[in-house]
Amino acid sequence: MARSLKKNPFVANHLLEKIEKLNMRAKKEIIVTWSRASTIIPTMIGHTIAIHNGKEHLPIFITDRMVGHKLGEFAPTLNFREHARNDNKSRR
């Protein structure tokens, strides 16, 4: 479901504070976060945010086309390997 337009997009407070500090200092550092539910806002453009996928942090460079999406959309949590092989020779 989409979030109501009356409400502002959700961005974790600690993440917003880190981005504002870096924007004031005009620095570009990697920001580590576990907040996959945060929405990407225009102030994040140009920053690299390391998003947790359950095992490690994946660094993602934020571009203008990502605005409005959630951070978790860019860090997949499941890596499908392949189905088990159907080995008919060993069954005979």
Curated annotation (Swiss-Prot):
GO terms for biological process: ribosomal small subunit assembly; translation. Transmembrane segments: none annotated. Keywords: Chloroplast, Plastid, Ribonucleoprotein, Ribosomal protein, RNA-binding, rRNA-binding. Its main location: plastid. It comes from the Eukaryota. One of its GO terms (molecular function) is structural constituent of ribosome. It is found in: Plastid, Chloroplast. GO terms for cellular component: chloroplast; mitochondrial small ribosomal subunit. NCBIfam families: rpsS_bact. Protein S19 forms a complex with S13 that binds strongly to the 16S ribosomal RNA. Belongs to the universal ribosomal protein uS19 family. This is Small ribosomal subunit protein uS19c. It comes from Buxus microphylla.
